[in-house]
Amino acid sequence: MERIKELRDLMSQSRTREILTKTTVDHMAIIKKYTSGRQEKNPALRMKWMMAMKYPITADKRIIEMIPERNEQGQTLWSKTNDAGSDRVMVSPLAVTWWNRNGPATGTVHYPKVYKTYFEKVERLKHGTFGPVHFRNQVKIRRRVDINPGHADLSAKEAQDVIMEVVFPNEVGARTLTSESQLTITKEKKEELQDCKIAPLMVAYMLERELVRKTRFLPVAGGTSSVYIEVLHLTQGTCWEQMYTPGGEVRNDDVDQSLVIAARNIVRRATVSADPLASLLEMCHSTQIGGIRMVDILRQNPTEEQAVDICKAAMGLRISSSFSFGGFTFKRTSGSSVKKEEEVLTGNLQTLKIRVHEGYEEFTMVGRRATAILRKATRRLIQLIVSGRDEQSIAEAIIVAMVFSQEECMIKAVRGDLNFVNRANQRLNPMHQLLRHFQKDAKVLFQNWGIEPIDNVMGMIGILPDMTPSTEMSLRGVRVSKMGVDEYSSTEKVVVSIDRFLRVRDQRGNVLLSPEEVSETQGTEKLTITYSSSMMWEINGPESVLVNTYQWIIRNWETVKIQWSQDPTMLYNKMEFEPFQSLVPKAVRGQYSGFVRTLFQQMRDVLGTFDTVQIIKLLPFAAAPPEQSRMQFSSLTVNVRGSGMRILIRGNSPVFNYNKTTKRLTVLGKDAGALTEDPDEGTAGVESAVLRGFLILGKEDKRYGPALSISELSNLAKGEKANVLIGQGDVVLVMKRKRDSSILTDSQTATKRIRMAIN
């Protein structure tokens, strides 16, 4: 009441009224702006004048018991007057200082865990190195980049479920934690955050940073991995750049990088197999990157790269609607065209069948090192505006655009025959034939293209056929610009189809991607890539093929053993033996195979001549198409370590060494696994042909006719004698027993008798 009375008195004075009405604050709109709603309209100002007051903070009454009235300097820390309109106490900012110095200490153990992404960022910056600043024009192009280093790749929905489960486990609501990564993260975080005193909302925000990829469409001139983007404001301005080397790597960048390498290797390998699509899927499903299944990564990771997109398309995932040609991503920004087959003649009078795009179209072209805007009509380039890092990159973009334009003068510039093939030795399609031809040498193309005088336009210059800049003349329709062309910003994905040869088409039938577009660049992956598929064994060279083949046989020995005796042809045709064939000298592949198959047939025919170690050792050689020959071998050659190495038919060698005591096999000195069963199963190698139910009488006896196989043996009557072929082509004389009771003793005596009979 006191206050109101005072105000009334003030208002009765004319001066007060004048000040209030003449100054501009009486605009109703302004008053409304600053007084309506709970949202603070000028936080900085508000903070300034609040902090200028003696007691700007309010606190719970209990604070009086916990903080003295004055600090060591005798300054008052809290006021005895209550806060108007609440039962809280007015407190001075000095109280905060006192509390920080003398207040109760709480455990800090959870802070680095909750604020993990911040702590890691500090470490990266501490160990990073900033180089000199260079002043130059920055060709920045907007790209979709990852702005959040150190995250897992969960979808927003998956992350939400994990966060609810970790932070608010008792809240109601259905949560589905299905993927492996969700379960692992939930378990890990629950353990880490036990008894955590940090506000749950804060924890939830921080978890979101850790789990979800956040992308922004930003102008970038240099590296695009997240550890560079987090310092974008420090490394590039409008006219300057500062060199920077990150002080650490983060898993999400490593995953992106390794995924691209794995996908490229898989697409390249699939291209040369009999059924590329089936092979590609088999490899994607059996590959792990940094211990996580590649198919799981593909489902979550937004990386757009040609090989990665081919793998996604094969899995039935949607991909970007832009298409790829010559390593550039093309996005049509306006116009339309229809496709017609046309036959054209090259400068060498070779006929090419090309699909001509009829109609006016505009495209953006974005590559790693150059970007461009292309306007074209039917088989005519109207305008190409290029920008790039250097002369070489600009030239690459110009060649791709000229070929893409399908102009007559480009086709006539071909010298010599076009016969480029892909990895599977199949001819490339005509457009890629042309592209390869000019990528090798574009001199004639540039010379024949034609030049024109140019107008002086800001930010644009001409480029001559020898790729030097000029302000007077330029290649017809081509200009070089200082400004880059932004990447296509939309994240829209479309349904695509993929054919057997890995050509990806949109629903209109336009080819978006094909294996020809997959880069040949080789890199070293940051995370371990484990290719379980036999098709990828050769990626690490011949030794890896050898070790992997034998490891595979040992791991699958139970099923291999049954197939070996019941359905050998099916076993020989297994794709796991395919890579091995490249190690066997071409000239002897068929002979080796015929020899080993005959040997195996003898083992099958003569009961008990089954020798596990020898079957494992020789099995891969039987996979080649066999040649019938009388050749006998005591060793087989494989090409590893740059020369032929021998595998002995009997006994150990550096290539294949079986240790009877430990029952372990080493191949080229590398452990290839253990045999779970005893290879000596009552036999002592091939010579111990244990013929149950037969008595071994001695050496071959010609009077009893030619040597029989095991199936013929079963027709003998009791007491009848015959010659039998065993093991390595040795023949012995046997007699079918008259009584069945003594069959058991055969096993023990046969071994000794065969030795005597043979020697």
From Swiss-Prot:
Pfam families: Flu_PB2_1st (PF20947), Flu_PB2_2nd (PF20948), Flu_PB2_3rd (PF20949), Flu_PB2_4th (PF20950), Flu_PB2_5th (PF00604), Flu_PB2_6th (PF20951), Flu_PB2_7th (PF20952). A motif (Nuclear localization signal) lies at residues 736-739. The record marks E627 as: Avian adaptation. It comes from the Viruses. It is found in: Virion; Host nucleus. One of its GO terms (cellular component) is virion component. GO terms for molecular function: RNA binding; RNA-directed RNA polymerase activity. Keywords: Cap snatching, Eukaryotic host gene expression shutoff by virus, Eukaryotic host transcription shutoff by virus, Host gene expression shutoff by virus, Host nucleus, Host-virus interaction, Inhibition of host RNA polymerase II by virus, mRNA capping, mRNA processing, Viral transcription, Virion. GO terms for biological process: 7-methylguanosine mRNA capping; cap snatching; DNA-templated transcription; symbiont-mediated suppression of host gene expression; symbiont-mediated suppression of host mRNA transcription via inhibition of RNA polymerase II activity; viral RNA genome replication. Its main location: virion. InterPro entries: Flu_PB2_2nd (IPR049110), Flu_PB2_6th (IPR049114), Flu_PB2_C (IPR049115), Flu_PB2_CAP-bd (IPR048298), Flu_PB2_middle (IPR049111), Flu_PB2_N (IPR049106), INV_PB2 (IPR001591), PB2_helical (IPR049113). The keyword Nucleotide-binding does not apply. Signal peptide: none annotated. Influenza RNA polymerase is composed of three subunits: PB1, PB2 and PA. Interacts (via N-terminus) with PB1 (via C-terminus). Interacts with nucleoprotein NP (via N-terminus). Plays an essential role in transcription initiation and cap-stealing mechanism, in which cellular capped pre-mRNAs are used to generate primers for viral transcription. Recognizes and binds the 7-methylguanosine-containing cap of the target pre-RNA which is subsequently cleaved after 10-13 nucleotides by the viral protein PA. Plays a role in the initiation of the viral genome replication and modulates the activity of the ribonucleoprotein (RNP) complex. This is Polymerase basic protein 2. It comes from Influenza A virus (strain A/Chicken/Hong Kong/96.1/2002 H5N1 genotype Y).
